[in-house]
Amino acid sequence: MFSQYGVDTTRVYSCGFSAGGYMSHRLACESPRCYAAIASVAGTMSTAAYSACIPSRPVPVLQIHGTADAVVSYNGGVGGVGVDDVITKWTTIDICPATPYVVQLPNTNIFDASTVESSLYGPCSSNTEVKLLKVVGGGHQWPGTTALLGGLGTINRDINASGEIWSFFRNK
């Protein structure tokens, strides 16, 4: 398929929302040479995948997650690890600086009851980076979307997750 459609195999990415985010992390753990970078929105790692994750090379990772996510808890829960543990896992794998560059992003929409804090770990070994966009007060939602997933919390409108993901991927 790759040769038939002329796919640049050095620019294949994975991103996913919720269970798709879990999938992206697992793909990076199990097949790191297939992906230039991954992004996860509102999904972390299962405890089993977290324990088994020993990729053969560093992988750039973007994690976007709401602190008020009641479906996939920011702090982890039954069967899943918390966001901070996921970030620590990838910064260890990618051999990143221990201290991130932290920026509070502009609160451009004061009515969405949430803000975004960006933590960038990098540059890491092999010129990778790990980035966390912590949506303070954000729910189990895709930031920037106009479609509301009913009952799943606040949608942040200060960032557009799709744009943030492409911005992260495009130079990897």
Region annotations inferred by a language model:
Residues 1-10, 48-55, 122-124, 171-172:
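Surface-exposed acidic, glycine-flexible loop patches that form ligand/cofactor-binding
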Residues 17-26, 71:
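Glycine-rich nucleophile elbow surrounding the catalytic serine of serine-hydrolase chemistry
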Residues 25-29, 166:
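Short, hydrophobic alpha-helix immediately C-terminal to the catalytic nucleophile
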Residues 29, 77-84, 155-160:
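Soluble non-cytosolic domains of exported or imported proteins
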Residues 36-126, 137:
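The feature captures the conserved acid-bearing segment of alpha/beta-hydrolase catalytic domains
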Residues 1-19, 29-34, 105-106:
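Gly/Ser-rich "nucleophile elbow"/oxyanion-hole loop immediately N-terminal to the catalytic nucleophile
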Residues 153-172:
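Catalytic active-site module of serine/aspartate enzymes centered on a nucleophile-bearing elbow/loop
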Residues 132-148:
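Active-site-adjacent mobile loop/cap segments within catalytic or ligand-binding domains
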